[in-house]
């Protein structure tokens, strides 16, 4: 798994004023990847109607065709609103991908490879080390878990069927899990009246 980026590095990547409609799109994609922890494939398959901007949520079809609803942060919502203003300049009404949230410069649904290449370009322009879309997902998971300590919520947001996947993903160690267990499970607590 890729390393999680620290918050300062994420900020250096995302805090820029886009120059032109392609950079407006790229910023919206990067903000969404980090804000919601989406998989690259999930971003590629998003349609406009999958985002509810007022409610700040996104409906995602994940692995195994499972649907989930994930929150979207304010900065990502603003970047998406900015993109939607420019999106119509690329939209091709004759294309089967006319409902796609993110379009390439030919008006078709953007590919995973295009997103990877555009993210590499954003990093190069800012003098940042190579950052890939999965690193943004990994950073999302790590930062939310560090702040909340809620492994189950992170599991839901990431769309993991098995919590063990989330544990590996966020590099939780057994010692941390043991502390949570010891403090939360009634039969694990020391000094209860049932102890002998």
Protein language model annotation of sequence segments:
Residues 1-196:
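Conserved catalytic core of the tyrosine transesterase superfamily
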